[in-house]
Amino acid sequence: MALSVDSSWHRWQWRVRDGFPHCPSETTPLLSPEKGRQSYNLTQQRVVFPNNSIFHQDWEEVSRRYPGNRTCTTKYTLFTFLPRNLFEQFHRWANLYFLFLVILNWMPSMEVFHREITMLPLAIVLFVIMIKDGMEDFKRHRFDKAINCSNIRIYERKEQTYVQKCWKDVRVGDFIQMKCNEIVPADILLLFSSDPNGICHLETASLDGETNLKQRCVVKGFSQQEVQFEPELFHNTIVCEKPNNHLNKFKGYMEHPDQTRTGFGCESLLLRGCTIRNTEMAVGIVIYAGHETKAMLNNSGPRYKRSKIERRMNIDIFFCIGILILMCLIGAVGHSIWNGTFEEHPPFDVPDANGSFLPSALGGFYMFLTMIILLQVLIPISLYVSIELVKLGQVFFLSNDLDLYDEETDLSIQCRALNIAEDLGQIQYIFSDKTGTLTENKMVFRRCTIMGSEYSHQENAKRLETPKELDSDGEEWTQYQCLSFSARWAQDPATMRSQKGAQPLRRSQSARVPIQGHYRQRSMGHRESSQPPVAFSSSIEKDVTPDKNLLTKVRDAALWLETLSDSRPAKASLSTTSSIADFFLALTICNSVMVSTTTEPRQRVTIKPSSKALGTSLEKIQQLFQKLKLLSLSQSFSSTAPSDTDLGESLGANVATTDSDERDDASVCSGGDSTDDGGYRSSMWDQGDILESGSGTSLEEALEAPATDLARPEFCYEAESPDEAALVHAAHAYSFTLVSRTPEQVTVRLPQGTCLTFSLLCTLGFDSVRKRMSVVVRHPLTGEIVVYTKGADSVIMDLLEDPACVPDINMEKKLRKIRARTQKHLDLYARDGLRTLCIAKKVVSEEDFRRWASFRREAEASLDNRDELLMETAQHLENQLTLLGATGIEDRLQEGVPDTIATLREAGIQLWVLTGDKQETAVNIAHSCRLLNQTDTVYTINTENQETCESILNCALEELKQFRELQKPDRKLFGFRLPSKTPSITSEAVVPEAGLVIDGKTLNAIFQGKLEKKFLELTQYCRSVLCCRSTPLQKSMIVKLVRDKLRVMTLSIGDGANDVSMIQAADIGIGISGQEGMQAVMSSDFAITRFKHLKKLLLVHGHWCYSRLARMVVYYLYKNVCYVNLLFWYQFFCGFSSSTMIDYWQMIFFNLFFTSLPPLVFGVLDKDISAETLLALPELYKSGQNSECYNLSTFWISMVDAFYQSLICFFIPYLAYKGSDIDVFTFGTPINTISLTTILLHQAMEMKTWTIFHGVVLLGSFLMYFLVSLLYNATCVICNSPTNPYWVMEGQLSNPTFYLVCFLTPVVALLPRYFFLSLQGTCGKSLISKAQKIDKLPPDKRNLEIQSWRSRQRPAPVPEVARPTHHPVSSITGQDFSASTPKSSNPPKRKHVEESVLHEQRCGTECMRDDSCSGDSSAQLSSGEHLLGPNRIMAYSRGQTDMCRCSKRSSHRRSQSSLTI
């Protein structure tokens, strides 16, 4: 749809002539100003006109096309409730089935029961569901009414002021004014914020579950407003994308009156449902309203997954339908045969009105339909309701398991999917993320390398080796220091001098206090408030012990920074001092960390305007700083630094200490900005400038203790990524402190107290494609435009400046040396399991940046291909970088991860790790968590070529197949062993397990080359698979590939947004509540806090849920078939007339009351094996993987047993009462009683756990039957005419035959079942049977039996001869295979390497791991050699054995036999 409106150009000219000022903005001229009318395509974009006097007509024309802000989540109205609810209920085939039977029963020729009685069950079900749906919809109506009537201030055009209105009155284009703690009523574009920096703080917990605050900034050009926003002065048109459900994606542009454009994104959008925090006032214009808001578009309702048991049950239901049809056919044919035996029409065969009789064929068809009505219970429709109730009970007990509760986070397991709990007991493959899932995701700065020099931080390493030194409850040795503004200057000078040396930074976390066995957070601060004492605190490790050697160089670098002048050359030198300064500046600046002080409240507290102490003190401080900045820098360094006491005296009592301060310590730090002749902001001031020489502590003494200056305010850093927070804390340990951050500038405090304010020109955020982040700043001392970049080493190394392009030969050699040594250190860090990041910089000229910024603004203003253009502009800037160094961050393994992985592996579960980390880091973590063992044969494949990948997969697969052939037992014929082509190994010998390590590029080659089948076949021989450098899309593709091709049950577990696709692709998705937000949790089926909880969740609760539900389903199917067959056998004695010997009300009560509760209790509370035994014997989990409790054989065995029991229950009473003159109901009552007794006793035999509740339910059901029968038979005189069951039960209770039959028949009926269960328990070889025997033993004997079991199950040690030999691979012509690291930049050498040489190289590398790193060694083999070498069993030589021992001593992280291709 094209919409043509008057452009605001002419109206703007008219307004300018009347004296209205022009609103300045950062724009790019893209449109011609001569055009008087502008055309917009409303089908592809959204156009928003402001609701003010100038655009009133355009707003009226456009806004009526958009929905209002009134929301309605109800499904019904008062008039549509009854018909629509019935229509929805009859969409279920079960209700249609019952309705079909009711209609059939209303036909006179097919009537079996009373018509009203047949309608009653269906009517009750429909009525109950209708009441439930009505109550739920009424609750939604009340909620909608409360939301729609919430108050908000909307700008009224006629009154030209903000008016209090309801949310439902908001329209697209309205101006909305919001205050602190108010909820955003619609999706609003932020135009004004009371924050002087144009920032609005949001809490998005209602959308994504994250409690940390988010920053939103006003649109460019509106951030410098010093007065209130005036809607009448807004003369811009907004064009943006159509409504969608992407919470983190938004793009559009603002067209100004001069037809220039300013682009904006999601950083300026306030989403509906968020809460304004720490911002007194925010004003914006409504972009999306009502059901078009992103929050409403994301309310798609709960996802429905069908469990494996339910899929199996649906198949068996079709078998039951087949049985029903067969029985009805027998009844129809039998009825025709029976009628054919009469030579004349019998008296009960009544003719129609014309006196004619039905033909035999038509009579048989009617009888077929009549038999369906009679045997309808054979289809267990109530089974679905029972299953839902059982699942609710299982989830209830699962959610209340204290073992799955995490004290640190105060969170327990969340069951977000109620219908797949039983699938937890059948998992065969687990796909896990690494960071935050296997590891803590609490990053700790471990070591770094700068300009090729490595700083190991040994003191930091020793401290970190102490397990959870700072996290233990009894060793909490720090207290939260709540420092006010005045405390910054209040410390005694002697305190500073006594704190010399490098000391670790103390944490400012709250102490944990035990309360009745559970831990809760107790504030240790002095400030009494309901809010947390630490605003925006992140649960990350902040303790860093500086390296003494690096600390000295940092001090020199800080002093060097002070000597810089405006004449600094454009091309920075590669000196160590300057590089160290730039390195720590990059750590401090290149991030998106939010800064606050520990005393900053969560919600802003306002003070009365009469309080002028704050303004007076700030004005004096600013005047003092302006005067002091006139001093020379050299004078400031020749003088000594001031003491805190003296500085406090000089400032006097004007320093504000109130918590309601509008400016925190960070704003005070940056209070002395000025503008020099160069046109850039030089924001640098020194604490030493404000006092005379000789007063207080010297600068040298201050630099000696950069990490212990407790007099300075304690800053809290809130980071989106734990990596960023760890780097900022590491820089803070060296006194490069991030003081404040705004959209316009970043302030950094140097070790000597000097504050530098960098103008923030542009921020290129991190994304999974670029794998890096950059900031463009203007240096306050030199005026240079500097690009600081950090990112993955695999990306940064390719973006560095080519040393060959450097004209200076010495500089070229130096660059190559730095690059090689940094890569060497990166490999060392990776082998130590550290996360690596490279730091680089680039100096950009003014002209280049101006040209690039113009392209960037055009990309931001683009609507169609905005993301592609932004990516392209980022790539144009992030190149020709200068390497500064790299960091190694430790991400500790979570507690219990190695034990959990080992246990899951014993349970027969294949574990794959899909991570985006580099290969060396992932492999190291895999060894640490026992995913890969020392004796594993590890295949590492790194290639981008499809042909090479196929050859490698074929050869590796061939070798593994041959080694598996060695494990097969010898073939025998009549007791004689047949000759074998390959030599066999002894039965005690075990061939080592294989592991596969593969990277993202190889995965691309596999998916693009149609090699998925070979890849999966290879993984079948591997115990563990490790996919490194994998993207979120690759993760989901792998999960779908394994799930669909192998037809196995899969589980994915992760904690980050990049794991969402993988979690949703698996049969069961588990999210971990970690440090990376709640997106993984919100998209998961279950949410846990620790990976170790997965062990009990699967092995115990998974086994129980599967075993209970599977056996309950089998029992339910058996119960219905057994009972219905009683009616079927009776048809052989009533001429297949569809008569019954049991009263119809008794039949209804049988399923409704008498046998409904025991299966529910059985499905919720039964425990076939105790939790302790299940955890001690993980092999028991394989019973669920193999579907031993419920499969095709168990179904048919139960069906045969049901037919047998029904035969016994019918024919023993028949023979007992044969020849007597009892009536039909007197004959049916014993059969009904016997059937109930047999079914309940069958249930009792299946129960493995007996409690008082079980006994009460079974006995109560049995007694209820007699109680209801006695009352019904005593009161029902004419209720079921003509055959009323009056006094039938009372008469049977006085008949001895009744007692004899009721006692003897169940025993005979259950004898085969009892014999089968006894034989299974005595001679059965299943693991479950053996475990049940062990479970019944006393605790001491049970523990001994479990130990004996585990000793028998433990595999034998791997003999020397059983280890496979690996030879280097012959390549296809022109292909290379790296024998060590995949990042080899040297040309490959064509040579042949024997097994011993490869093994020696590996062992030697491990023995010298701390001294050097493996170099770039590549090997390309001759075309005549085999890819993996010949497969043969060979004894290791003495030298090789010694080398193996060397490998064992040197590192536990390496495998005994590995091959990198």
Swiss-Prot record:
Recorded GO MF terms: ATP binding; ATP hydrolysis activity; ATPase-coupled intramembrane lipid transporter activity; glycosylceramide flippase activity; magnesium ion binding; phosphatidylcholine flippase activity
Stored Pfam families: Cation_ATPase, PhoLip_ATPase_C, PhoLip_ATPase_N
Localisation: Late endosome membrane; Lysosome membrane; Endoplasmic reticulum membrane
Primary location group: membrane
Mutagenesis / variant outcome for changing residue 748 to L: Found in a patient with early-onset Parkinson disease; uncertain significance; impaired ATPase flippase activity
Transmembrane segments: 83-104, 111-132, 317-338, 369-390, 1112-1132, 1145-1164, 1195-1216, 1224-1246, 1253-1273, 1292-1316
Changes after translation: Autophosphorylated at the conserved aspartate of the P-type ATPase signature sequence.
Name the record gives this protein: Phospholipid-transporting ATPase VB
Organism of this sequence: Homo sapiens
